[in-house]
Amino acid sequence: MARFLGLCTWLLALGPGLLATVRAECSQDCATCSYRLARPTDLNPLACTLECEGKLPSLKTWETCKELLQLTKLELPPDATSALSKQEESHLLAKKYGGFMKRYGGFMKKMDELYPLEVEEEANGGEVLGKRYGGFMKKDAEEDDGLGNSSNLLKELLGAGDQREGSLHQEGSDAEDVSKRYGGFMRGLKRSPHLEDETKELQKRYGGFMRRVGRPEWWMDYQKRYGGFLKRFAEPLPSEEEGESYSKEVPEMEKRYGGFMRF
């Protein structure tokens, strides 16, 4: 009883793997039958696969496929079977990659036929690549030489750049020596003594351009209070006769306009 339970346990454990293997073999055999028939529509691959897996009660399609597989194995020699397997592989590749194989498949086959691989050539893979892709490999070699030349040219340019930087640094040091030697002469020209005397006289004469000499005392007080207002609006200055009356009006104006008069 224990052995039977152990066997059942093993079957349960191995069941999914065996089932997947059987399914793969059934689908492969049915696809092979459908491919080898003159008219693939005579055999339904889906029905054949289901009958092979035992999911359909009828076994007509699967029996026909098995007979076809046995006949092809008996009739075909080993070389033919290998060629047939190659055809099947190419057919699967064509299904998988579609238009790519249609466009470039003939070129790949032609290259394989023109340059078949031998034992010695397999050992020397570089020669085979040279035969197959000769001009392309030469072009790559030329590009490598060009890259080497360009690297040498780059080194020369970098060397020239370093020399130029050294010369610029030397020129900068020379400029520093000149500035140390001549000081403020490089910043601006120094005025002559004659020009300095003239500017001093002009400053003495017109320096206080906004200042007025000989103003009355009441006007000085008035300017202290309302100087900014007068500068902004440039009102006419009162005469000496009107000074007293104008000074009496100032407190009234201050009361009326207050902070507006202050700036």
Swiss-Prot record:
Tissue: Secreted by neuroendocrine chromaffin cells through cromaffin granules.
One term of GO molecular function: opioid peptide activity
Residue pairs linked by disulfide bridges in the UniProt entry: C26-C48, C30-C52, C33-C65
Signal peptide: 1-24
Propeptide intervals in chain numbering: 192-203, 213-223
Keyword DNA damage: no
GO BP annotation list: aggressive behavior; behavioral fear response; chemical synaptic transmission; defense response to bacterium; G protein-coupled opioid receptor signaling pathway; locomotory behavior; neuropeptide signaling pathway; sensory perception
Main location (coarse class): cytoplasm
Mod. after translation: Proenkephalin-A is cleaved by CTSL to generate Met-enkephalin.
Keyword set includes Secreted: yes
InterPro entries membership: Opioid_neupept, Proenkphlin_A
Pfam families: Opiods_neuropep
Keywords recorded for this protein, A-Z: Antibiotic, Antimicrobial, Cleavage on pair of basic residues, Cytoplasmic vesicle, Disulfide bond, Endorphin, Neuropeptide, Opioid peptide, Phosphoprotein, Secreted, Signal
GO terms for cellular component: axon terminus; chromaffin granule lumen; dendrite; extracellular region; neuronal cell body; plasma membrane
Subcellular localization, as worded in the UniProt entry: Cytoplasmic vesicle, Secretory vesicle, Chromaffin granule lumen; Secreted
UniProt site positions, description: Cleavage: M108, K109, K110, G130, K131, M210, R211, R212, G214, R215
Phosphoserine: residues carrying this PTM: S247
Domain of life assignment: Eukaryota
Family the UniProt entry places it in: Belongs to the opioid neuropeptide precursor family.
Listed PANTHER family: PROENKEPHALIN (PTHR11438), PROENKEPHALIN-A (PTHR11438:SF3)
Protein name: Proenkephalin-A
Organism: Bos taurus (Bovine)
Encoding gene per record: PENK
